[in-house]
């Protein structure tokens, strides 16, 4: 029996694949659980329509991520933190602080998209990747400095 998969199934294939399975497997497992539909002419046409819609949505999201990438290219995050003599920070800079700085600048990014491997604990300039979309990753400049000593 041929079925069209509605979910990714490791042993069979990906969403939208037309696969041949045993009739009992289809009737007793795939169809009742909503993991697949029978491969008819009508269902195949509906699948093509859904694929076109998904491609359109994916294209739209990718374009939005690229626009956000262009915004981020011109921004340098400037953070001032108390630091010791050797440039070691009292505390650390996290992705939450970077996201708050960006929000002040008018760029709203979820902190989870800022891929900071570990918190920044030294004064200096860093390049931090921001995963806007699976296909689009921006590189954000973060400059951490100590406040100027008052004399």
Curated annotation (Swiss-Prot):
Matching Gene3D superfamilies, A to Z? Answer: Ribosomal protein L9, C-terminal domain, Ribosomal protein L9, N-terminal domain
The cross-references to Pfam families, in alphabetical order and at most eight, read: Ribosomal_L9_C, Ribosomal_L9_N
| UniProt GO BP | translation
SUPFAM superfamilies linked to this entry: L9 N-domain-like, Ribosomal protein L9 C-domain
Keywords from the UniProt entry = Ribonucleoprotein, Ribosomal protein, RNA-binding, rRNA-binding
Q: Which InterPro entries match?
A: Ribosomal_bL9, Ribosomal_bL9/RNase_H1_N, Ribosomal_bL9_bac/chp, Ribosomal_bL9_C, Ribosomal_bL9_C_sf, Ribosomal_bL9_N, Ribosomal_bL9_N_sf
Protein's job: Binds to the 23S rRNA.
- What family name appears in the similarity comment? Belongs to the bacterial ribosomal protein bL9 family.
Entries under NCBIfam families matching the protein: L9
Record's protein name = Large ribosomal subunit protein bL9
Biological classification of the source:
Bacteria, Pseudomonadati, Thermodesulfobacteriota, Desulfuromonadia, Desulfuromonadales
